[in-house]
Amino acid sequence: MNFSNRYIYILFAVLVYACTKTPMPPDPPSDSLTDIPYNPVAYTITPPPGFPAMSIPADNPLTVDGIALGRHLFYDPILSADSTKGCFSCHALSGSMTDNLAVSAGIDNINGRRSSMSLLNVGYYYNGLFWDGRSENLEAQALKPVEDPIELHENWDNVEVKLRRHVSYPTMFRKAFGISAKSEITRDLAAKALAQFERTMISSGKSKYDLALTTGTGVEFSDEESYGFSLYNQLETRDGQCGHCHQGFLLTDNVYRNNALDEVADLNGFVDKGRGEVTNILYDNGKFRAPTLRNIALTAPYMHDGRFLTLEQVLDHYATGGHYSDNVDPIMIQLKNNPLTEPEKQAILALLHTMTDTVFVNNPALTSPF
């Protein structure tokens, strides 16, 4: 074999080997996120007139990117097992962050026991969250719906995997919390982001109620609304008893009470034990958090189980003092002994409508980013 033929033979053999060799798999995608800049920008909440500064946890300061991540997670059904529901399903902006249902159904169309509470000003709440106060703070609260079998019916291990594999979330978690790798995306960071977004759900200060109580706005209550305000706050001989539970800038005192919804033979007789399920204290059975009255006209139906469809029905309940049980709130007994008249109910109703904050429910920063 001469040199030319030998050269051709070797070249042919190399080409055959190259074509038949098993190709090497591509390098796996990098878990690292360090090539993405982390430059957190602090976000400052400006409270409306009459509101104090919000207390923010030291381990979860508000940042622009943290809030943006929380907003996406809030409106993303990725948190549910079948990707059909999310936080937004029970907390719609049009209903002041409620769903306007007596009770809410999860992904399996199983109804829960209670109405969704409004998230308006939830960052100011203390003494527990939910109707029964079972979560200490927003970070703890955000973890519960995902694994609740009646709500999103997912588990956080799966959610963490979905978030790590997502096309956008690793970058967003990096920008929000400075993590170095996708594997560092955790449920706790997701809960922190959700809590940051929820802390931005604050009143605008532009309701008629707020403007009428702020000097220099030129807004005044009507005569009927003024009478309702007097009854609400016991500024006259008659006391509507409203301001005892629905007081301060939040229009709630964050206390759990039995407001005489059900009559029971003994304190074990409540179908829904409310606060008692959390504390295991018999005297807490049948007690529920006093909700805020801000945007109350937008959050029907009312009470923890949505039993009252209208505010008129609510006032009728309070006008009669409700039903007796051993731990009924003393205020209800006073109402029973001194019931509201029809003109008094109408005046209080007029005042309640001044608490509607249309600026809040039209805030574009609180809408879905998708």
Q: Where do the language-model regions lie?
A:
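Generic hydrophobic, aliphatic-rich segments that mediate packing or membrane embedding
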Residues: 83-86, 115, 134, 155, ...
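C-terminal capping alpha-helices of c-type cytochrome domains
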Residues: 156-175, 179, 183-204, 297, ...
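Short glycine/threonine-rich turn/loop motifs
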Residues: 24-144, 207-309, 313-317, 322-327, ...
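Short, conserved catalytic or interaction motifs in soluble domains
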Residues: 21
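C-terminal motif of bacterial Sec signal peptides marking the signal peptidase cleavage site
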Residues: 17-18
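Bacterial N-terminal signal peptides that target proteins for export
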Residues: 1-8
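A gly/proline- and charged-residue-enriched helix-loop-helix capping module
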Residues: 149-154
